[in-house]
């Protein structure tokens, strides 16, 4: 069962995903139906990420600004908000306050 605060009956990959010299660290969570998510933290910084699959980024805590590939507009997101990123694209993220996030691969 999944609630607003936790994921139940899942497997977690023990080894962390560490990117950008430790500025972004996440763990992969595997669900019984075959889907996966990552739970992570990004420290205050400016980064550029690439995606393979479409992603839904849910902000649990913190604050960031995001600019999707091909857009000139920055959007600001905080706790309780989310944004979608198309597959096979890139996005810029400027983390203003340490970001706690859940990333769903769609």
From Swiss-Prot:
Its EC number is 2.4.2.1, 2.4.2.2. Catalyzes the phosphorolysis of diverse nucleosides, yielding D-ribose 1-phosphate and the respective free bases. Can use uridine, adenosine, guanosine, cytidine, thymidine, inosine and xanthosine as substrates. Also catalyzes the reverse reactions. GO terms for molecular function: guanosine phosphorylase activity; purine-nucleoside phosphorylase activity; thymidine phosphorylase activity; uridine phosphorylase activity. Coiled coil: none annotated. Belongs to the nucleoside phosphorylase PpnP family. It comes from Burkholderia ambifaria (strain ATCC BAA-244 / DSM 16087 / CCUG 44356 / LMG 19182 / AMMD). It catalyses: a purine D-ribonucleoside + phosphate = a purine nucleobase + alpha-D-ribose 1-phosphate; adenosine + phosphate = alpha-D-ribose 1-phosphate + adenine; cytidine + phosphate = cytosine + alpha-D-ribose 1-phosphate; guanosine + phosphate = alpha-D-ribose 1-phosphate + guanine. Keywords: Glycosyltransferase, Transferase. It holds the Pfam family Ppnp. This is Pyrimidine/purine nucleoside phosphorylase. The gene is ppnP. Disulfide bonds: none annotated.
């Amino acid at each position: 069962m999944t609630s607003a605060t936790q994921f139940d009956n899942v497997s977690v990959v023990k080894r962390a995903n560490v990117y950008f010299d430790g500025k972004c660290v996440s763990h992969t969570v595997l669900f019984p139906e075959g889907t996966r998510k990552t739970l992570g933290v990004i420290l205050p910084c400016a980064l550029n990420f690439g995606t393979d699959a479409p992603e839904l980024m849910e902000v649990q805590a913190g604050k960031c600004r995001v600019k999707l590939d091909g857009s000139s507009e920055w959007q600001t997101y905080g706790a309780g908000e989310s944004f979608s990123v198309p597959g096979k694209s890139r996005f810029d993220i400027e983390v203003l306050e340490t970001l706690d996030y859940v990333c769903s691969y769609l």
